[in-house]
Amino acid sequence: MKHFVDSLSIVKVNGFDNVTSIIDVGTGAGFPGIPLKIVFPEIKITLLDSLNKRIKFLNAVIDELGLENIETIHGRAEDFSKKEDYREQYDLCVSRAVANLATLSEYCLPYVKVGGCFIPYKSGEIDEELNNSKKAVQILGGKIEEVVKF
């Protein structure tokens, strides 16, 4: 239950009600992408993961739940972010438990449209990691607007 609640916690973020497309990088078992799709069926969701067995599992879950307008991609985040069909195509990029924040920013920010948002789900004490990521975020054209702790 905790994973579902955590997945939906981003709806409190300013501007979420304008989101029409989300990419979930390193989706794993589909968190937060699948719960977001269930609650917000109108949002286009892309689930990206490097392990094909996870993608096969997610496809089975999507079929079983009858979810529509949701895409799964087997591939590496750093490779797909260079492809024109995915680069700067999403209002929101989310990711949880994938990498440190500097690396994660390099993977995820290229997917976000100008004016969009990247929300990394992080746990524990993140102040040092946040500080270490500031340069990468700036180089990639992003800025840290808010840190929300749940």
Task: Place the predicted regions along the sequence by residue.
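Helix-to-beta-strand junctions that scaffold the AdoMet/dcAdoMet cofactor pocket
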Residues: 40, 112-114
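Conserved beta-strand signature within the Rossmann-like core of class I S-adenosyl-L-methionine
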Residues: 115-125
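Conserved beta-strand segments of alpha/beta enzyme cores
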Residues: 44, 69-71, 117, 143-146
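Active-site capping/gating segments
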Residues: 125-150
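Conserved SAM/SAH cofactor-binding pocket of Class I
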Residues: 5-97, 105
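Short glycine-/small-residue-rich Rossmann-like dinucleotide-binding loops
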Residues: 97-98, 123
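Class I SAM-dependent methyltransferase Rossmann-like catalytic core
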Residues: 1-2
